[in-house]
């Protein structure tokens, strides 16, 4: 299986950020499903002019024939050769209609998610894991009798984000934790396949008398707005993607009854962990009590991207010529990022579906070194079986922060990127297609650290 998720899911997806949608069965001859099938057939035939025939203006601008061809070249390395289209279904998302066509590749089955606007033009496209709808199965350590959940909204008028506050029952005040997503248009639960790691953490910690705030990511709720507005698209960086909303979440908790305002913590996972130093800096006047870095990347994103591609194409034990091309393409994209100049900051071009300013903003950013400026306690957590953010990153955090008396480190031998247990070579199957939960001992360690601080 050669599916890339997590750190780079947002960089390899064309089009609209997904949101919670209402699913319904569609008749076989549904017009939009037929359009989606024709689009996929054109892709498979490498007829990219035909593929973009139904693109709306925004998609044509950001993902025209050349960029679509560039994307399609990466697909065999991720999924194997395309075999056939299978079943299809429909979703409705506000003004959009979504056709999902199951596609069988040589090494994995994926759903092609083709988004149509009210004029039946294609407004977005992405591949997502093909999974049957799964009911959330809470981990055994979560006790719903101990807490309640409240719907909240964070952010300004232009960027309001719905979320959930999971708060223990009782008078309080309770310590609280804000959860900050990894990359990609994540929902509040960081849902991937049948799994919801952020919900595991929220329910698990609330069972230990710790309140948890989680929210929809900005790129999930406002994906179309970010794409269509040129000013926003060109200037969009990790500040807008993650940092600002994490700080707003802390402010909301400070104004919430039942919360111990002197004991509000922030946890960042994956990209969120990488950005903890920036969140700490942006919220330095808020008195945040401490920070937790879960599988936080320390290396440049483009370097980790090449490593991920190389790992994924090697999972079957052989490197084919197509695999080599995939690795070479990844290296070429990485080199494009490294070759960017400050003069490119206002350009509308995209590299790995992110603007030059996005990449330039991260140039020279060393999260581990930046973390030295954090005066509050820091806890770094890492799974040894994580191929996306590796023990190399963990050692970088450790090397930089080890002299600090208020820094703590935990390395878990059996855990993957989502802090689920597994054995052998880690693959995306472990969390994209197999039900799992954040390990209970991780919840216990986080709870103990928060209560200690």
Model regions: which residues?
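Alpha/beta-hydrolase active-site loop
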Residues: 234-256
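Short beta-strand/loop motif that positions the catalytic acidic residue
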Residues: 374, 380-382
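Accessory cap/linker subdomain of secreted extracellular hydrolases
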Residues: 285-373
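Short solvent-exposed beta->alpha transition segments
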Residues: 33-34, 49-94
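Cap/lid segment of the alpha/beta-hydrolase catalytic domain
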Residues: 180-241, 310-313, 421-432
